A protein has these predicted regions:
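Conserved hydrophobic helix-helix packing surfaces used for dimerization/oligomerization
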Residues: 8-9, 120
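N-terminal Rossmann-fold NAD(P) dinucleotide-binding loop
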Residues: 19-20
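Redox-cofactor binding/interface segments in oxidoreductases and associated redox assembly factors
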Residues: 79-80, 122
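Conserved glycine-rich cofactor-binding loop
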Residues: 15
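Aromatic pocket-lining residues of Rossmann-like dinucleotide-binding sites
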Residues: 26
């Protein structure tokens, strides 16, 4: 399989629904073979990793981690759907407040570990304010 680049791409929130779908899309489209799945929830990201290992993506080098330093170091591309989902009884403002903290940590990780990143795509809830 031919890829558009060999640079590292990190998928943040890879254990969630959007993130796990992005992994498959990235590999099916041949964007890069070097994909790191990152999520703070180890059982979720490990499950997605196991699923991807069962797929036929020749030449893919997929890794996973719950360590931000390992995930972000050397990344040139980042897709993040790592915001928290809305829970019962939460207002949009509650969700925004919680996801602002997550977004700040996300930005800090980029600054610390991959300041030369080329492209970052962020999808957080509430989606109309990110």
């Amino acid at each position: 399989m031919e890829f558009l680049t060999n640079e590292k791409l990190v998928i943040v929130g890879a254990g969630g629904m959007i993130g796990s779908n992005m992994v498959q899309s990235v590999l099916m489209l041949g964007l890069t073979p070097n994909v790191c799945l990152y999520d703070i929830y180890e059982p979720g990201v490990h499950g997605v990793f196991d699923e991807i290992q069962q797929c036929a993506f020749p030449g893919a080098n997929v890794t996973y981690t719950v360590d931000p330093k390992e995930a972000f170091t050397g990344a040139k591309y980042i897709i993040s759907s790592g915001g928290a989902p809305r829970k019962d009884g939460m207002t949009r403002e509650d969700l925004l407040k919680g996801n602002c903290k997550i977004a700040a940590e996300f930005g800090d990780n980029i600054k610390k570990y991959c300041p030369d990143v080329e492209h970052v795509v962020v999808i957080f809830n509430p989606a109309d304010v990110t």
